[in-house]
């Protein structure tokens, strides 16, 4: 298994689906074999993949349509399906062992399990799930057991918050904390005021408002780090930027620590066990500096502040699209070795 490429299929070619495809196609240890999306043609799929307003044009190899069921990335053929019902997608025939479920629709265990009927061996849901086990790379992926066929990669915000919370809790202990994420626009929002029965504020124009919103990201940290269960909660502000978000974690510490000691601990971890997952910067950065950053969480040492040795506000950036999509692939690689 070690030298063989891991074969992956993607269901749903939206923001995350397309970026997961970009991540896969730039790596040597994984291979994209199939994409399913019932709502777009292969021609349109090519266009959407090739041109990206945030991450720029695809420049790694030529992409063309071979026929209505096949895309060519350079010489590499990728099978295209347009099937609505997940259990009818012939993943097995396409050779896909892992399926990335990125439609945003089939996020619970039973719905995602439909992919197994078509021959997939494992499914990774690229969203939080109410009942599938959630894994955050760098935090709890070592708890994955090979008999788990359906897992969730949690949310982009949980992937940013959990590594930071883990370091702080391991080193200083968290009594309790509140998180705010200042979060870029996502596809569920509206370009102008429109109907949104479940979330009235969420129906207001995305490019013109700061919109308070709920997020389960902080509570989900309690699922991946049980020792923090019930100690964290949070909310979100949706703001008119297209990508990159930032977590503000305000915590009460068990063990008194100066802000410099906290910085030192985070810096150490960012160069050690969490290298590539948790970053550390003392530069005067702003959000666009993190477009295309593949780390889950980049701690901004200059932006945080301490009120006392037991009460601090910590700030950490994340490319909520690219960083998260990279983790989806990392989780698959980890699962394949289990």
Curated annotation (Swiss-Prot):
Residues 154-338 are annotated as: Catalytic. Residues 183-206 are annotated as: S-loop. It holds the Pfam family Gp_dh_C. InterPro entries: GlycerAld/Erythrose_P_DH, GlycerAld_3-P_DH_AS, GlycerAld_3-P_DH_cat, GlycerAld_3-P_DH_NAD(P)-bd, Glyceraldehyde-3-P_DH_1, NAD(P)-bd_dom_sf. NAD(+) binds at residues 15-16, 37, 84, 320. The lineage of its organism: Eukaryota, Viridiplantae, Streptophyta, Embryophyta, Tracheophyta. This is Glyceraldehyde-3-phosphate dehydrogenase, cytosolic. Key enzyme in glycolysis that catalyzes the first step of the pathway by converting D-glyceraldehyde 3-phosphate (G3P) into 3-phospho-D-glyceroyl phosphate. Essential for the maintenance of cellular ATP levels and carbohydrate metabolism. Pathway: Carbohydrate degradation; glycolysis; pyruvate from D-glyceraldehyde 3-phosphate: step 1/5. Belongs to the glyceraldehyde-3-phosphate dehydrogenase family. GO terms for molecular function: glyceraldehyde-3-phosphate dehydrogenase (NAD+) (phosphorylating) activity; NAD binding; NADP binding. Its main location: cytoplasm. It is found in: Cytoplasm. The active site is at residue 156. Its EC number is 1.2.1.12. The gene is GAPC. D-glyceraldehyde 3-phosphate binds at residues 155-157, 186, 215-216, 238. The record marks 183 as: Activates thiol group during catalysis. GO terms for biological process: glucose metabolic process; glycolytic process. Plants contain two types of GAPDH: cytosolic forms which participate in glycolysis and chloroplast forms which participate in photosynthesis. All the forms are encoded by distinct genes.
């Amino acid at each position: 298994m070690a030298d063989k490429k891991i074969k992956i299929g993607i269901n749903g070619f939206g923001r995350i689906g397309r970026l997961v495809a970009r991540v896969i196609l730039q790596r040597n240890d994984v291979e994209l074999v199939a994409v399913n999306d019932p709502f777009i043609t292969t021609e349109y799929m090519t266009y959407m993949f090739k041109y990206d307003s945030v991450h720029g044009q695809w420049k790694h190899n030529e992409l063309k349509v071979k026929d209505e069921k096949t895309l060519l990335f350079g010489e590499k053929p990728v099978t295209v399906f347009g099937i609505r019902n997940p259990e009818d997608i012939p993943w097995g025939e396409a050779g896909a062992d892992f399926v990335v479920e990125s439609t945003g629709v089939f996020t619970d265990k039973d719905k995602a399990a439909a992919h197994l009927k078509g021959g997939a061996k494992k499914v990774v849901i690229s969203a939080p799930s109410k009942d599938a086990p959630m894994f955050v790379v760098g935090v709890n992926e070592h708890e994955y057991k090979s008999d788990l066929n359906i897992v969730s990669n949690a949310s982009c915000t949980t992937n940013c918050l959990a590594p930071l919370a883990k370091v702080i809790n391991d080193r200083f202990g968290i009594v309790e904390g509140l998180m705010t994420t200042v979060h870029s626009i996502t596809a569920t929002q509206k370009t102008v005021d429109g109907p949104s029965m479940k979330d009235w504020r969420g129906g207001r124009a995305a490019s013109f408002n700061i919109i308070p919103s709920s997020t389960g990201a902080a509570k989900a940290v309690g699922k991946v780090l049980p020792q923090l269960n019930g100690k964290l909660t949070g909310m979100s502000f949706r703001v008119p930027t297209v990508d990159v978000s930032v977590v503000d974690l305000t915590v009460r510490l068990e063990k008194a620590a100066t802000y410099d000691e906290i910085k030192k601990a985070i810096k150490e971890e960012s160069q050690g066990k969490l290298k590539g997952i948790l970053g550390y910067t003392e530069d005067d950065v702003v959000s666009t500096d993190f477009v295309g950053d593949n780390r889950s969480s980049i701690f901004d040492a200059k932006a945080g502040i301490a009120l006392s040795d037991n009460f601090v506000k910590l700030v950490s950036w994340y490319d909520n699209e690219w960083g998260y999509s990279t983790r989806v692939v990392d989780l698959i690689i980890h699962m394949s070795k289990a």
